[in-house]
Amino acid sequence: MASPIEVRLHMTYPDFTVRTDLTLPGSGITALFGPSGSGKTTCLRCIAGLEKAGQGFIRVHDEVWQDTEKGVFLAPHKRAIGYVFQEASLFPHLSVRANLEFGMKRIPRQQRNIQLPQATELLGIDHLLERSPDKLSGGERQRVGIARALLTSPRLMLLDEPLAALDARRKSEILPYLERLHRELDIPMLYVSHAQDEVARLADHLVLLEAGNVLASGPIRETLARLDLPLAMGGDAGVVIEGTVSAYDRNYQLLSVTLPDSTLCMRVAHAEMQIGTLLRVKVQARDVSLNLQPDDQSSILNRLPVTVMEEALADNSAHVLVKLDAGGTPLLARITRYSSDQLNLHRGQSLWAQIKAVAVLA
């Protein structure tokens, strides 16, 4: 198992203070999520060494990058990072190939873990190598920027809202490439975003920031299901589930997806996928209703036995959020307070969740 990433920061500005005490996974994608001004980019810049925390301790893969108490501060160029900004900032007078080669120059050949052909193939930019940056779309420029960061052979990738400047179509073009990097490269990523759909699709671990403070840090499926956090109170409240494709009905074009560590299964309308494939889906709280008995005379495909774990008032007093356990997988249901009283909901109660819609993320 990869060594964890430790980030302890205390920075004071005239009208803003950042305090973090984080131990993050040394693999996978960790999302730093929160509204504008919550401290996401400040944390990333401190990790990169572009800002120096007044008090700080940063350790990545057992290498200390900053320790204020011991006077340690590793210069940015000595930190093995690949930094991706909102804008790719390519050199306009160089071709795509020359831009990529520029990123490799400071890395000795014997230390290059990623070669040019591998990076261009991973990002799907082989056909762009001889073009100049002004001939690229926004999505293509950003893919080149990501490839350039990879070619520095980083031990850690830092992505600061890399899709924020792109429209929905360009975002949808890049997301599969980020997922591929996640699958095929053993490089941890810290991904800054305020877009919940991106985070739900990409992240394994979620750090929720607000006004410079860490509200929560944990696996995404657990953090999204916490009723004490603002995420559960919004209209997009829901959970992320990573199940396994266990069957496919060609006649009705329905995948059967087995929930993690469970025999429970959901059916999802989707094109055929190989049995055993991991599939990430999102179930919105507003798409889950509750019933005391299984309703077999319904158009709703997914009916799961669940247990009530806890309940909280939603963002208005007419609704409640109910946290449910479906064979070890957390679910959320948003129902009226009246319905909660009619069902006499209480902790430990067994009932049935009816899931009206399941969104395939990846």
From Swiss-Prot:
Sections of the chain in a coiled coil: none
UniProt keyword list: ATP-binding, Cell inner membrane, Cell membrane, Membrane, Molybdenum, Nucleotide-binding, Translocase, Transport
Residues binding ATP, per UniProt: 34-41
EC category: translocase
Cellular component GO terms, alphabetical: plasma membrane
Disulfide bridge partners, by residue number: none
Family matches, as PROSITE patterns: ABC_TRANSPORTER_1, ABC_TRANSPORTER_2, MODC, MOP
Reactions performed catalytically: molybdate(out) + ATP + H2O = molybdate(in) + ADP + phosphate + H(+)
SUPFAM superfamilies reported in the protein's UniProt record: MOP-like, P-loop containing nucleoside triphosphate hydrolases
Domain ABC transporter span(s) in chain numbering: 2-236
Location of this chain's protein in the cell: Cell inner membrane
Topology class, membrane: Peripheral membrane protein
Protein purpose: Part of the ABC transporter complex ModABC involved in molybdenum import. Responsible for energy coupling to the transport system.
Protein's name according to its UniProt entry: Molybdenum import ATP-binding protein ModC
Source organism: Pseudomonas savastanoi pv. phaseolicola (strain 1448A / Race 6)
Gene name of the record: modC
